[in-house]
Amino acid sequence: MNHGKKTFLLALASAVVLSGCSGSGQQMTAYDAQYLDYFDTVTSITIYAKNEAEFEQYKSLAEDTMKKYHELFDIYDNYDGVSNIKTINDNAGIAPVTVDPELISLLEFSRQEYEKTGGRVNVAMGSVLSIWHEYREAGLKDPSRAQIPDMQKLQQAAQHTDLEQVQIDPQASTVYLPDQEMSLDVGAIAKGYATKRLAETLEEAGVTSALLSLGGNVETIGTKADGKPWRV
């Protein structure tokens, strides 16, 4: 989700030597794929399949799923036909935004995490995090001028981080930020949520054995084809 930068895909798929039999006795082979263009991190998937053709079907589904969540949760870029986190932020103080039900689900989950962590996980911290991002990028561009943000500036931004103000309407599938200075940043939970949903999607499609890692957020499906547990 790098602002102003093109994303690129590195998909490396190969059958590894390890293989095994499923519970039905079907010979299964582990296939791998790695990507660099989702969530600004390394994504790797290992899926046991009967053959390469079956793996390609699962891989295509995984790519479509990761692309969907990458675009929905992006705070920097717009995508044709997609109302994402950036769309919500751009309409702060203007109007509710109709979004994909998955965004409603993510934001409702974020409220649960907010309560569970006593407010330490707060997706409404976008106004503060954007300042840190701005200073970090400036420091990377010119290390000799790197500095931390002014405390007063951060404190002012912190006045616009009340998660309770975020208006979520599940029935209408809309999200609205009434405070025009507020913005959402779901980076703290997006990758974990997307990894979990990816696992659920692949399992529903018939995958019985897989290891999925999205930036270190790991989910497994079943065991290895030989019955041994995945080592994470």
Residue ranges and their predicted role:
Residues 179, 188-214, 219-220:
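Cysteine-centered nucleophilic/redox motifs
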Residues 51, 183, 192, 226-227:
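Short, surface-exposed beta-strand-loop junctions and turns on beta-sheet-rich folds
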Residues 3-184, 200-203, 208-209:
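A contiguous, well-ordered beta/alpha segment that forms the leading edge of an enzyme domain
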Residues 216, 220-232:
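Hydrophobic/aromatic-rich core segments of domains that either
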Residues 49, 197, 224-225:
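N-terminal low-complexity, intrinsically disordered patches enriched in charged
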